[in-house]
Curated annotation (Swiss-Prot):
Site (Cleavage): 23-24, 245-246, 491-492, 765-766, 835-836
Biased composition (Polar residues): 55-66, 496-510
Record carries keyword RNA-binding: no
Region (Disordered): 55-76, 496-530, 773-792
Gene3D superfamilies for this protein: 2.60.120.20
Organism: Simian hepatitis A virus genotype IV (isolate CY-145) (SHAV)
Name by which UniProt lists this protein: Genome polyprotein
Record GO terms (molecular function): channel activity; structural molecule activity
Any one cellular-component term (Gene Ontology): membrane
Motif segment ((L)YPX(n)L motif): 167-171, 200-205
Amino acid sequence: MNMARQGLFQTVGSGLDHILSLADVEEEQMIQSVDRTAVTGASYFTSVDQSSVHTAEVGSHQSEPLKTSVDKPGSKKTQGEKFFLIHSADWLSTHALFHEVAKLDVVSLLYNEQFAVQGLLRYHTYARFGIEIQVQINPTPFQQGGLICAMVPGDQGYGSIASLTVYPHGLLNCNINNVVRIKVPFIYTRGAYHFKDPQYPVWELTIRVWSEFNIGTGTSAYTSLNVLARFTDLELHGLTPLSTQMMRNEFRVSTTENVVNLSNYEDARAKMSFALDQENWRSDPSEGGGIKITHFSTWTSIPTLAAQFAFNASASVGQQIKVIPVDPYFYQMTNSNPDQKYITALASICQMFCFWRGDLVFDFQVFPTKYHSGRLQFCFVPGNELIEVTSITLKQATTAPCAVMDITGVQSTLRFRVPWISDTPYRVNCYIKSSHQKGEYTAIEKLIVYCYNRLTSPSNVASHVRVNVYLSAINLECFAPLYHAMDVTSQTGDDSGGFSTTVSTEQNVPDPQVGITTPKDLKGKANKGKMDVSGVQAPVGAITTIEDPVLAKKVPETFPELKPGESRHTSDHMSVYKFMGRSHFLCTFTFNANNREYTFPITLSSTSNPPHGSPSTLRWFFNLFQLYRGPLDLTIIITGATDVDGMAWFTPVGLAVDTPWVEKQSALTIDYKTALGAIRFNTRRTGNIQIRLPWYSYLYAVSGALDGLGDTTDSTFGLVSIQIANYNHSDEYLSFSCYLSVTEQSEFFFPRAPLNSSAMMTSENMLDRIAGGDLESSVDDPRTDEDRRFESHIEKKPYKELRLEVGKQRFKYAREELSNEILPPPRKLKGLFSQSKIS
């Protein structure tokens, strides 16, 4: 009767319940077994019970009217995102310039049983997080000097120490501040950090001497240093049982048949692809902190350390303390152990272009005690790097654009923006050759530092104050790319050298990538000055505190100037995509036998030297940033008159591959190669191949600046293999040269300090590689030792001398041939050469 009164949905529902769920009591009694199934649990625990009963629940949770404990309940934020003291050290007066006071793997130090955060971390496998650190010192008023604290993603590698300001950093100046705070996001080649088995450190904190530590008489020869750190935005994944060893010990370890254009972004673009489909790759800045790089002004607008000089008490009023050429190539910071040349970020970028223009910005940061007093005058004299300025007096210098700085007070830094004043629209990069024509100049003027008021101080403090000189640029425009690794030796000890550049994007607007604020964003009276002349606007940023990250980003306007006008170029040569859209040399190899294959990895690692690593421009570029993701375009040039059949294929990292850098018979099947994706070609019908290498990787990104195991696993983009057949080595020569370029879908994240010039590794030419044994000659060299000496000799001769030398050798060989021939007895040839016959 009940069933008859139920509606349709009630009938269907009870039927399904009878089939899928619990039986009624009568059925349980009939089958002599309980028929109750329950699925219970919480979070990542599930329990399925076949003989379950309902939960016995009595009452509910109640809040306390009178709190038993008034602290906030424990949570991931209170336990995992609080500051912990991870390191203590002493900064000593014996520490030299650039001495590394501390080098800390912040994450591994936070993963410590002394810290509450480990209670969360040790039960999880993966995590994503940011890091925030505080570095504290406790100097006295009688101590002076400075430290730089920089958070470096991955590893410092061969990056320039003078360009540490490119990284997230803080500057400690004994006279200005005693604490710095740095907050960084998650920057990693993988989607998450593996606590149990890390590939490499995520963030490395380096603390180095930026200005040497000096003390007064009777003052302690040290100051204490403490480092606090915490996780931010902590995400934990992969609950795991507790094991005995949670972390391993760290260890370190489109073309035509005959013509191909490698010159520009459009013509070097590949039309064919190794990808499964003509697919595109979506942008993903999630592991790069959202800092995507598109323009070289990301580096040139950051002040980096170019030089250092001392303001001594012995300097008299009007004495020239320092003369600096106004060009972007100037840098003087070196180190002898190891031998390093610390290039500035500005010089590193500008050395790769032929011409430059723009406004150079000099930041002069002083390191006094509170008991030092004195003034410096800065002026610039228009001209070039060859002008003589030693005779210009202090009074004469006031005629030129100048600024005077009081070294003592709450502001530590004079920002001196030198406007573009020149007789040519652009200046030349004269460092790429040794001889110059009159009118080919690099610098636009010279900047002179004078003693304006003598340095005074008590006798119990140091009798000098050190001044750091930083260099950057505004409105920088560089054009006409080239490859050049500058050597600081051409400048050190002589202030007549120089270097400078400008940008062809919208003028007078700094690159927003570095987060430069506008003057309107700066609050407080400290950022506003007064001028004695009414109606004249005070210069913005002429005096600042470079130790403060916000004040350091003020756009400098030391002197009035006009806008530079419209660039003559329709293409921005400082665009990362335009510059690296041009194909750059990667490697070359020669086949010496038939039915062989050759595999070469495309690696970004800065520890792999050419010819098995990226050379010159590629090496420099891929170490300018931390993360790369996206496809690459490969151009293969075939050299030699051959009729050879070939096949090429691309292998993503982690799969089976033939031994790299070795010419050998392939151990892989044709099925495997074609499944990966292959192209077939014939060298008689084509002289070049342009192909797009897909972004096929199990990683989020790859990087060239990693430490430990990460340098091996996370630095390789993929591997390219070429196999040949029908090759007759005895009378044919077959060589391949490979060139690499970026694509419109390439992405570059998080800037790094540029490579030192000594780590650039220029490519060797083919003959040098054969002579060094790296490559086997394609054919037996028919030349004798005497032939080689002769060729080596004539290569060193100018053209006129070369012709005379060749003429002598021809006469010599002619005489030898005549003397060796057996001539018949001479006959008289009557009238053969008479005048009548010749006519």
